[in-house]
Each structure stands twice: as C-alpha cells, then as structure tokens.
C-alpha cells in the first residue's frame, strides 16, 4: 500500500538529500541533520536536531514514527531522546529529531549526517466504551512478567 505524502524543503541545502527508500524492501526513510556546523553531544546530553524538512500526511488513517538508526544506537549509544517520535497526520511543522547520547563518550553530529529513520504507519482510532467490569480472560490483571519466561 502506498500513499502520497506532501513534503516541504525548508532549507534548500536539503533539496539534494530528501528522504528516499534505500531499497525496495526498506520500511524506513533516513532523516538527516540540517546543521550549519558539527554539534558535540556530551554523555547524557540531548539535542534537538532540525531536518530542514516538513511533511503533511493529511490522512488521519496514517502517522509517521521517528526511530533511531540501529548503527548509531549500537555502535555509539545515540538514540532518540523521546525514544520514539510520533508525527500526527495533521502536523505541518519542521521534523526535528531529539538525539540523546546515552554512552560515556562524546559524539559528534555532522551536518547532513543520517540521524534517524521515519516510518509511515496505518492508524486506527479507537472508540472507548465505559464498563464496570471486563469479561474474564485467562490473563486477567497479570502484568509485567505474568505470562512466564520462554
């Protein structure tokens, strides 16, 4: 299933590096840092990185999620400050990525470096019905770890 997403290039330096799917099977599109100069993230520090791009999904049946790039997280301890970014279908502002250095070493974010990936996902908006009791289930109120270890 494909949808058309409107995209604005807010900084012309990003015009040649707009997000594209790297392969036919790619789920995510890489987002890049729209920076004038390198930014050093100290251990434990967060920084809100502009991308120079805005998108408009328009259709409430879709949203976009921003996720860490696996290599940055595994090799350098760089993840998203909010763990997952959610872009609602009606948002039209600049995409920004909160980077968090959870490592013990400084990390340098370079201009135009790939910093996160964006995945467009289908959304279901639930309607809620208030009840006094739930119909029983085998799990009941069992929470964390209640289904056993595998």
Swiss-Prot record:
<dbReference type="InterPro" id="IPR033704">
    <property type="entry name" value="dUTPase_trimeric"/>
</dbReference>
<dbReference type="GO" id="GO:0006226">
    <property type="term" value="P:dUMP biosynthetic process"/>
</dbReference>
<keyword id="KW-0546">Nucleotide metabolism</keyword>
<dbReference type="GO" id="GO:0046081">
    <property type="term" value="P:dUTP catabolic process"/>
</dbReference>
<dbReference type="InterPro" id="IPR036157">
    <property type="entry name" value="dUTPase-like_sf"/>
</dbReference>
<comment type="similarity">
    <text>Belongs to the dUTPase family.</text>
</comment>
<dbReference type="GO" id="GO:0000287">
    <property type="term" value="F:magnesium ion binding"/>
</dbReference>
<comment type="pathway">
    <text>Pyrimidine metabolism; dUMP biosynthesis; dUMP from dCTP (dUTP route): step 2/2.</text>
</comment>
<dbReference type="Pfam" id="PF00692">
    <property type="entry name" value="dUTPase"/>
</dbReference>
<feature type="binding site">
    <location>
        <begin position="69"/>
        <end position="71"/>
    </location>
    <ligand>
        <name>substrate</name>
    </ligand>
</feature>
<keyword id="KW-0479">Metal-binding</keyword>
<comment type="function">
    <text>This enzyme is involved in nucleotide metabolism: it produces dUMP, the immediate precursor of thymidine nucleotides and it decreases the intracellular concentration of dUTP so that uracil cannot be incorporated into DNA.</text>
</comment>
<dbReference type="GO" id="GO:0004170">
    <property type="term" value="F:dUTP diphosphatase activity"/>
</dbReference>
<feature type="binding site">
    <location>
        <position position="96"/>
    </location>
    <ligand>
        <name>substrate</name>
    </ligand>
</feature>
<keyword id="KW-0460">Magnesium</keyword>
<protein>
    <recommendedName>
        <fullName>Deoxyuridine 5'-triphosphate nucleotidohydrolase</fullName>
        <ecNumber>3.6.1.23</ecNumber>
    </recommendedName>
</protein>
<dbReference type="InterPro" id="IPR008181">
    <property type="entry name" value="dUTPase"/>
</dbReference>
<dbReference type="InterPro" id="IPR029054">
    <property type="entry name" value="dUTPase-like"/>
</dbReference>
<feature type="binding site">
    <location>
        <position position="82"/>
    </location>
    <ligand>
        <name>substrate</name>
    </ligand>
</feature>
<feature type="binding site">
    <location>
        <begin position="86"/>
        <end position="88"/>
    </location>
    <ligand>
        <name>substrate</name>
    </ligand>
</feature>
<keyword id="KW-0378">Hydrolase</keyword>
